[in-house]
Amino acid sequence: MASHKLLVTPPKALLKPLSIPNQLLLGPGPSNLPPRIMAAGGLQMIGSMSKDMYQIMDEIKEGIQYVFQTRNPLTLVISGSGHCALEAALVNVLEPGDSFLVGANGIWGQRAVDIGERIGARVHPMTKDPGGHYTLQEVEEGLAQHKPVLLFLTHGESSTGVLQPLDGFGELCHRYKCLLLVDSVASLGGTPLYMDRQGIDILYSGSQKALNAPPGTSLISFSDKAKKKMYSRKTKPFSFYLDIKWLANFWGCDDQPRMYHHTIPVISLYSLRESLALIAEQGLENSWRQHREAAAYLHGRLQALGLQLFVKDPALRLPTVTTVAVPAGYDWRDIVSYVIDHFDIEIMGGLGPSTGKVLRIGLLGCNATRENVDRVTEALRAALQHCPKKKL
């Protein structure tokens, strides 16, 4: 029998059933879940080290190899969001004193700089204003000057809406004995990406964008060059949880008996498996086409409202996340609030260096439809009519 009186009573809020609003998520992610992925989240638990779970993990690895377009054996899932995958890449590849070149044209490059500094690397940011991208010439100048072991680029910069070209960067990096790390969290499934053909050494992405899975798992793959760098390091990675040698074994990437590392998020992996199955059934090229066509339709509807697209060059616009310049005289927070309060549609403002400059509209996976474009543009039309506007 308990000997002490409880100091904390049951929270009243938890004595009521959970209630979730029905909203259309057209921000930069997470996205709405298709019925098949929602159903996967309600399946019964199995053992995290059972043969059935290992089979699911192997199927997930094959799915990642398909969406990444890679044959890398060292391909797995990180139990954490895209930030976790970025940190896993950096803590395993970089050692204190290593030179690290970063394309910092938005918040994700800024985060890479932060993590690199925490590791003790010599970090060299190539800083650009929101909306900027990198040319081969600019990167080659950085490679020649700083002689880095690793270059970071964001393929889909969701805070600014920029799609970074990747062709030629892998070959360029390898000429300077540098590895190429690419963030594809916001671009995967929405625009062409070829890990092996483009010479990308480390590629990672997240579950909650165009894959339409719940947040909390991330996808990552390493080339043989990246594996050699990680496996020949002189010091242990400072994170045990993100140690790729352990994770590679647990995910069956090293042909050795699997050993326990951590308890994986079994239910989340069911959902991720189903999201990869859906995109495999649709076909990558069809998924890319769907996002390209939906984005083009959105751009036309936005311009018909008199709104200006933040990224001027159509070739550099990220199909999955469109950035719109905040219209003159309006507070972006008023527009975002009006759209969610009156239409149950989520859009977002800027993030990091783009805060206050843009509105962000996401067309991710199953949400990339003309019907959703019509809904969000009508909501924006109403917001522009009813939100307060300052005289300029």
Swiss-Prot record:
Modified sites of kind N6-(pyridoxal phosphate)lysine: K209
- Subunit structure of this entry? Homodimer.
Q: Which domain of life is it from?
A: Eukaryota
- Tell me the impact of changing S158L: In HP1; loss of alanine--glyoxylate aminotransferase activity
Asked whether the UniProt record includes Transferase among its keywords, one would answer yes
Q: Which family does it belong to?
A: Belongs to the class-V pyridoxal-phosphate-dependent aminotransferase family.
Q: Do you know which PANTHER family this protein is assigned to?
A: ALANINE--GLYOXYLATE AMINOTRANSFERASE, AMINOTRANSFERASE CLASS V
Question: What does this gene product do?
Answer: Peroxisomal aminotransferase that catalyzes the transamination of glyoxylate to glycine and contributes to the glyoxylate detoxification. Also catalyzes the transamination between L-serine and pyruvate and contributes to gluconeogenesis from the L-serine metabolism.
**Catalysis performed (reactions):** L-serine + pyruvate = 3-hydroxypyruvate + L-alanine; glyoxylate + L-alanine = glycine + pyruvate
- Any Pfam family the entry gives: Aminotran_5
Taxonomically, what lineage is the organism? Eukaryota, Metazoa, Chordata, Craniata, Vertebrata
Instruction: Summarize how pH affects activity.
Output: Optimum pH is 7.5- 8.5.
Record has Cytoplasm as a keyword: no
Activity regulation note: Alanine--glyoxylate aminotransferase activity is inhibited by 1 mM (aminooxy)acetic acid by 97.5%.
Q: Which organism is it from?
A: Homo sapiens
> Where is the protein situated, by its record's location annotation?
Peroxisome
BP terms from Gene Ontology: glycine biosynthetic process, by transamination of glyoxylate; glyoxylate catabolic process; glyoxylate metabolic process; L-alanine catabolic process; L-cysteine catabolic process; L-serine metabolic process; Notch signaling pathway; oxalic acid secretion
* Identification of the protein by name: Alanine--glyoxylate aminotransferase
